[in-house]
Amino acid sequence: MPLSYQHFRRLLLLDNEAGPLEEELPRLADEDLNHRVAEDLNLQLPNVSIPWTHKVGNFTGLYSSTVPVFNPDWLTPSFPDIHLHQDLIQKCEQFVGPLTKNEVRRLKLIMPARFYPKVTKYFPLDKGIKPYYPEHVVNHYFKTRHYLHTLWKAGILYKRESTHSASFCGSPYSWEQELQHGSTSLNGEKGHGTESFCAQSSGILSRPPVGSTIQSKFQQSRLGLQHKQGQLANGKQGRSGRLWSRVHTPTRWPSGVEPSGTGHSDNLATRSTSRFHQSEVRKETNPSLSTSKGHTSTGHAVELNTVPPSTVGSESKGSVSSCWWLQFRNTEPCSDYCLSHIINLLEDWGPCYEHGEHHIRTPRTPSRVTGGVFLVDKNPHNTTESRLVVDFSQFSRGTTRVSWPKFAVPNLQSLTNLLSSNLSWLSLDVSAAFYHLPLHPAAMPHLLVGSSGLSRYVARVSSTSRIYNHQHGSLQNLHHSCSRNLYVSLLLLYQTFGRKLHLYSHPIILGFRKIPMGVGLSPFLLAQFTSAICSVVRRAFPHCLAFSYMDDLVLGAKSVQHLESLYTAVTNFLLSVGIHLNTAKTKWWGYSLHFMGYIIGSWGTLPQEHIVQKIKDCFRKLPVNRPIDWKVCQRIVGLLGFAAPFTQCGYPALMPLYACITAKQAFVFSPTYKAFLCKQYMNLYPVARQRPGLCQVFADATPTGWGLAIGHQRMRGTFVAPLPIHTAELLAACFARSRSGADIIGTDNSVVLSRKYTSFPWLLGCAANWILRGTSFVYVPSALNPADDPSRGRLGLCRPLLRLPFRPTTGRTSLYADSPPVPSHLPARVHFASPLHVAWRPP
């Protein structure tokens, strides 16, 4: 007869009518009993032939591809002018005095952050934007491109200008050296010497941002490089020849990277394997086409070979031969859905390219990407805005993967010890926290994103296109990309983006200037940064508590008035160092702090309501007697594991599920096991804060017997059969707790001390978790343990009782500056010693 739920509860000693603990508990360690119960509850994981269940409620397999939903109305979030001040350490020192070594070390880590992987794989530009939404290819392309453009404008990305130069917007840092041509400054106070102009290490001309100074020195010829003084002709033939040949090397065009749609008279340029168009070279060799600010350049080609000097820049609009978009203007429409109808809507489509306010030299950056991007909903609660997902997973894979640094995450007990108090709380929202931390420009070539331009993208998606054919000149090839879908999509997008459609249809390569989210280094750096900032705040306001986990910052103070003053002072400080807070999202929690999925109050910690609701839904949909795919079990265990510390039996109750996942077997829930788990999770108990105290109760065991020292009283007992030493020690600790009721117990066993009962026999682990819930353990060496003699059967000898203090730990939660203890009572209305009047100093 299968084991009923009531019988199972009694077996686990969860009912009150159980017999004496010393007799009942050792029975649960019996291997035979554990096997029989596992068999009865169907926990033996037989190899089932029934088909597995791959979906339980919302849970599907961990690696199953849930189809993301594309929202054509996604808004691109705005990024404020985020610029973390470079003198951050000095500003913190002005605020709080000298910083501790830990704080300085952490702040230096991110000023600037460095990232040097062992190996970087480069992918073709076609893989820049992932075809995540096959039904909305064009729409997704433009929305992603707009998102990238927004990030570049906000100073979060560099734009690759050539193999060795990049441009960006926003305020420069001191390590971002402005691009110098040899000894010449950007602003062109001195002339550009020919030597330095040619000395780019890759042999590609870099774009002079200010055209006029060079123009005065160089006559405009087909190359734009004939010096008035005849320096090039005078003994420098070899170098100018080298420059000319490099300019003509087809595979080496800089990142203006547009597949050319027209036949040039020069065959080499036409057949270039990468088919990048010549706008960059054209722009560099004819500086008259660069605007004086170096901001935008007209995308109108000047043919390299046959243009006489007089025609350069003479047409206001220039020739459109190299721009795929503008070529449609001069062609006959091929159908009602020809793109020329859209291109003819506007006379001025704006520039082909934009350039940043600042230009810097970079290490060699190929015209490739190292990761793909796509858009998803910002979060489950906000589907109106999009979020950019960057896939740099190449750095976490294979033999050359980067092993990311580890950092301490506060465990539940540490968090409760630290934050469970009667303070008033609020949470601060740091907007785009990752994008605060600057990256060294040397990391840029490893973190490249971008797109190959609309024509290539459309060609790749539409199977009929012959754009890769070398016959670029034929118009019917140009019109091969015309289709009803593309026409309708572009017409709708035209209402959103207007003339920017032209800019976005060109290829672009961007590198990260601030840390991206898709790299394992980023969470580590963010955690170091926010923990150092909180440490500074805690020392500046000693009677308050500031704590952070990643971008979640919380502040606590003894009264609401105190908290308001603290909030003003801290936000002013954070804004003064360049940390951008979203003040609209500040949450005032009162006395129950919501943090990291928990509710933390003076009574302890519980999981937040939405997690409890999820667990209820999970149990409602959990099938009985049906094999469930182990990947779905991973999802179920993830959810139940979060709330396990709040249940009677804790993690040990989930061990059968863990075992099936490890064995990659399907799991079958028996009605009894499901009822047992369900009951466990319907009644959640708070995890309380540990209190300091003196240890008065000690436990010890040998494989054959146990001994207790409770105050001056000594007790001993024997086991029916010898037990493994860890099991015996755990039983002794349980007896000590049940006999004395003490919540601080001394033991010399490290496994009991760790409070992880998952490696014990299953039934014993479940029962012990409930008996020892809320118990704190203190380590006492065997030689000093007063319970050592009784456990060996010697009651007559009494070792003196130790005075062993227990101090609750906050783990390795990066609290370098200990805050002074907070008095537990609320102050009187205006008590003379109120922290507002005495301890609190304005910044």
UniProtKB/Swiss-Prot annotation:
Gene name linked to the record: P
Domain notes: Terminal protein domain (TP) is hepadnavirus-specific. Spacer domain is highly variable and separates the TP and RT domains. Polymerase/reverse-transcriptase domain (RT) and ribonuclease H domain (RH) are similar to retrovirus reverse transcriptase/RNase H. The polymerase/reverse transcriptase (RT) and ribonuclease H (RH) domains are structured in five subdomains: finger, palm, thumb, connection and RNase H. Within the palm subdomain, the 'primer grip' region is thought to be involved in the positioning of the primer terminus for accommodating the incoming nucleotide. The RH domain stabilizes the association of RT with primer-template.
Reverse transcriptase domain location: 357-600
Organism for this UniProt entry: Hepatitis B virus genotype H subtype adw4 (isolate Nicaragua/2928Nic/1997)
Region (Polymerase/reverse transcriptase domain (RT)): 347-690
Region of interest (Terminal protein domain (TP)), residue spans: 1-177
Note: Hepadnaviral virions contain probably just one P protein molecule per particle.
Bias type Polar residues, positions: 262-276, 286-299, 307-316
GO annotation, biological process: DNA replication; symbiont-mediated suppression of host innate immune response
Disordered, as annotated region: 228-316
Name this protein carries in UniProt: Protein P
